[in-house]
């Protein structure tokens, strides 16, 4: 039965309830904007499906759990970080020899519109899997910034070199540069002082393990 989960609406709750995705990282306003644009359609078997007009692709997309998170993160990029839709690409092709994979969200460089600047991963609900995926994408494209989120937890990375991803506190807003937000390597004291564990919903155990894995 539906019990309001945070700021989730019934429609979004129903889509996410059997998944590993949550909406804690997103504002009430963003969730309300997404919900206002949801259209229900009935399939041949009478089952109802939710669709929404994609903020970037400008066409109707079925709202599966990972698509809910993607649309909410796009809203965040537009309304909180100030990135124009013109700099965003979805399902961006990343080449590994003959193999082609698709990055969920890519923000292109402001001055070089063909160069990836930020890559966002929402389809891997676990941090370790998402980070590995992002490492491969950034190494292939040269993108310096990566973000992983499942809607409950979020992590930001700066690709220092192919073998080292440094945690950063956030990604730059459209008006900022990477150097404006880049920080020294995290310490446990940093984490406590900045309350990052609570904000990002990542456990101390996971964060320490992540630091040790680098």
What is each of the regions a protein language model found here?
Residues 1-145, 152-214:
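A short, conserved, highly charged catalytic patch centered on acidic carboxylates
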């Amino acid at each position: 039965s539906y019990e309001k989960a945070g700021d989730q609406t019934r429609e979004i709750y129903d889509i996410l309830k059997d998944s590993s995705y949550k909406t804690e990282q997103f504002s009430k306003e963003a969730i309300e904007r997404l919900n206002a644009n949801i259209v229900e359609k009935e399939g041949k078997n009478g089952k109802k499906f939710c669709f929404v007009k994609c903020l970037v692709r400008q066409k109707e997309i079925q709202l599966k759990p990972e698509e809910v998170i993607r649309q909410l993160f796009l809203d965040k990029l537009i309304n909180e970080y100030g990135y124009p839709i013109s700099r965003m690409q979805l399902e961006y092709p990343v080449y590994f020899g003959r193999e082609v994979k698709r990055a969920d969200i890519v923000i292109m460089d402001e001055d070089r519109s063909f160069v990836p600047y930020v890559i966002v991963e929402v389809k891997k609900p676990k941090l370790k899997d998402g980070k590995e995926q992002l490492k491969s994408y950034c190494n292939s494209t040269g993108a310096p910034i990566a973000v992983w989120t499942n809607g409950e937890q979020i992590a930001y990375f700066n690709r220092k070199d192919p073998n080292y991803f440094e945690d950063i506190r956030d990604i730059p807003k459209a008006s900022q540069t990477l150097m404006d937000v880049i920080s020294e390597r995290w310490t446990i004291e940093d984490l406590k002082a900045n309350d990052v564990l609570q904000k990002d919903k990542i456990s101390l155990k996971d964060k320490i393990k992540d630091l040790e894995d680098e």
